[in-house]
UniProtKB/Swiss-Prot annotation:
PROSITE patterns linked: RIBOSOMAL_L9
Keyword Isomerase (UniProt): no
GO biological process, one term: translation
Role summary: Binds to the 23S rRNA.
Entry annotated with the keyword RNA-binding: yes
Gene, per the UniProt record: rplI
Pfam family, one: Ribosomal_L9_N
Residue ranges of coiled coil: none
Homology family: Belongs to the bacterial ribosomal protein bL9 family.
GO cellular component labels: ribonucleoprotein complex; ribosome
Keywords from the named record: Ribonucleoprotein, Ribosomal protein, RNA-binding, rRNA-binding
Molecular function via GO: rRNA binding; structural constituent of ribosome
Protein name: Large ribosomal subunit protein bL9
Length: 173
């Protein structure tokens, strides 16, 4: 199936590009999500005319998301959970919980689909989690999972000492 992208799609392409994709990918994902339209002759002509307009709209969205990313990137999300003696959580911290807490912190609705977890969070510690609000823009937040408030303070002190020991090395190089 040939499609014309009307929004940028990560790992596929930019607005106005024509791509041949698997039928299922086009029918079940790209078309219903309004990321692409079928590449008919009429649609090709329409997209050529509307491409500039679509790119301008995308630039506006990018600038808004850049502002939101600036708010998000310095966030530290703290989760206090019950754990076993060896630090393993009874359950896990998932992308829905992270999205909910991040939405409250920045006063902007963030979907759990925008939270990219490399691995499941099943033990205490400090984790870097990717937040992707746009196909071309992403940022990271720090997620701290601990048993108690005192453990959180220990993690934060530890993180500050790591920063202070790495900064002078960067300056001297």
């Amino acid at each position: 199936m040939e499609v014309i992208l009307i929004k940028p799609v990560r790992k596929l392409g930019k607005i106005g590009e024509i791509h041949k994709v698997a039928d299922g990918f086009g029918r079940n994902y790209l078309l219903p999500q309004k990321l692409a339209i079928r590449a008919t002759e009429l649609n090709k002509e329409l997209i050529v005319k509307q491409k500039h307009e679509l790119e301008e709209k995308d630039k506006q969205i990018k600038s808004e998301i850049t502002k939101i990313n600036d708010l998000i990137k310095d966030q530290k999300l703290i989760f206090v959970r019950q754990t076993s003696d060896d630090g393993k959580l009874f359950g896990s911290v998932n992308n829905k919980e992270i999205a909910e807490k991040l939405s409250q912190a920045v006063s902007y609705p963030i979907s759990h689909l925008n939270i990219i977890l490399d691995t499941q969070i099943k033990s205490t510690g400090i984790y870097k989690v990717e937040v992707r609000l746009h196909a071309e823009l992403s940022t990271e937040v720090t997620v701290i999972v601990a048993r108690s408030e005192s453990e959180i303070q220990d993690y934060l002190r530890e993180q500050k000492t790591e920063k202070s020991t790495t900064e002078p090395l960067a300056e001297s190089a």
